[in-house]
Amino acid sequence: MKSSIVAKLEALQERHEEVLAYLGDASVIADQDRFRALSREYAQLTDVTRCFKEWRSAQDDIEAAEMMLDDLEMREMAQEELKIAKARSEELEQQLQVLLLPKDPDDERDCFLEIRAGTGGDEAAIFAGDMFRMYSRYAETRRWKVEIMSASEGEHGGYKEIIAKISGDGVFGQLKFESGGHRVQRVPETESQGRIHTSACTVAVMPAIPEAELPEINAGDLRIDTFRSSGAGGQHVNTTDSAIRITHIPTGIVVECQDERSQHKNKAKAMSVLGARIRAAEMQKRQLAEASERRNLLGTGDRSDRNRTYNFPQGRVTDHRINLTLYRLDEVMEGKLDMLIQPIVQEYQADQLSALSEQD
C-alpha cells in the first residue's frame, strides 16, 4: 500500500482516539449538537480504524512468516502462513480503499421519496402504489420512519403521485440509486384477454435538507394557491381551503401538500419539499456534466433514466444499469431490496476507485 495512504490512515486513527476522548468530556456531553456530531464522526471512523488495525496485523504476519522461510523445518508451514497472510492483506487493502473513498455528505441525511405514475393509465397508478408499498416494507426492515407528505390517489387504486419523507440512519445514501424510470410488465386485473401490458412510473429521491441549509427562496418567486383537500369522502374531508400548491416561478417546480388539516402545516411541508427539489435540480446539472465524462449510475429521477423492469409473468426483475437480472420478483416487491441495491452501490464504488486511479 502507498506510503501516502498509510499516512492518511494513521492520521484517521489518531483522530478516532481524539474523538473518543472528546465523547468522554463533560462539556461535550452537555452540548447535545456537538455530542451527536462527534458520535456520528466516531462511528464513521470506527470501521476504517478497525480495518487498518487488521491490515497492520496481516503485515506483521507476513513479516513473521518471511523470517521463518530460512528455517528448513518450518519452511512448508511458513509458506502456507505467508500465502494466507498475503491474501488477507490484499483483501483488507481493497476494503480500505473503499472506506477511504470521498463521502457524499448527503448520504447520512433523511430523504424525500417521490413516485409518479407515468405511461399506462390506471395500471401505472396501481404500479406506483405497489412501488410505494415496496419501499415502505424496505424502510420497516431498516427501522426507518415513513411519513406521507402529499398523495394524489388513482381512480382505481394506487397513486398518480405520492411524496413521502423517510427518516433514519443513512437513508439517502441507501436509496439515492432508486431515482429514475421503473417499468412494469404484467397482466392487469381488468384485462379479460390475458394480455401483458407495459406501464411505468418515475422515482425521485432527494436528500432532506435542514432549514438552515436550504437554498434561499425569494418570496416574490413563489405563487401560492390554496384549495380544498380531495379525499374519499366522510368525516375527514376538509371543508376549508387547507391544501397548498406552491409554484416556484423561475424553475416551474410545483409542489402540492394536502395531507394535514392545517394550512400552516401543509405550507411548511410543501416548502421543505420545494427547497429539496430546487437543490436536487442544481445537483442534477452537476451530475449531468460529470456523466458526459463517465457513466453516471445516479439517476436524475427523469423518465428517460431506465433503471429497472419488473416482469411479473416471468417473476423477473432486471436492473439495466448494471445488467443484473434476478428471478426473485416476489421477494423484491415485499421490500427485500438489498439484493438490488448492494450490487449497484458496489459498482458505483468501483467506478469511484477507477476515477481516483486515473487521477493518480
Swiss-Prot record:
Q: Which is a Pfam family this sequence falls into?
A: PCRF
Compositional bias, Basic and acidic residues, is annotated for 291-308
Task: Extract one GO molecular function annotation from the record.
Answer: translation release factor activity, codon specific
Q: Where in the cell is it found?
A: Cytoplasm
Q: Which family does it belong to?
A: Belongs to the prokaryotic/mitochondrial release factor family.
Write down what this protein is called: Peptide chain release factor 1
Which keywords accompany this UniProt record? Cytoplasm, Methylation, Protein biosynthesis
Question: What is one GO cellular-component annotation here?
Answer: cytoplasm
UniProt xrefs under InterPro entries: PCRF (IPR005139), Pep_chain_release_fac_I (IPR000352), Pep_chain_release_fac_I_sf (IPR045853), Prokaryotic/Mito_RF (IPR050057), RF-1 (IPR004373)
Q: How is it modified after translation?
A: Methylated by PrmC. Methylation increases the termination efficiency of RF1.
| Xref: SMART domains | PCRF
Q: Which region ranges are annotated with the description Disordered? A: 291-312
Q: Which residues are reported to carry the modification N5-methylglutamine?
A: 235
- What is this protein's function per UniProt? Peptide chain release factor 1 directs the termination of translation in response to the peptide chain termination codons UAG and UAA.
Question: Which domain of life does this protein belong to?
Answer: Bacteria
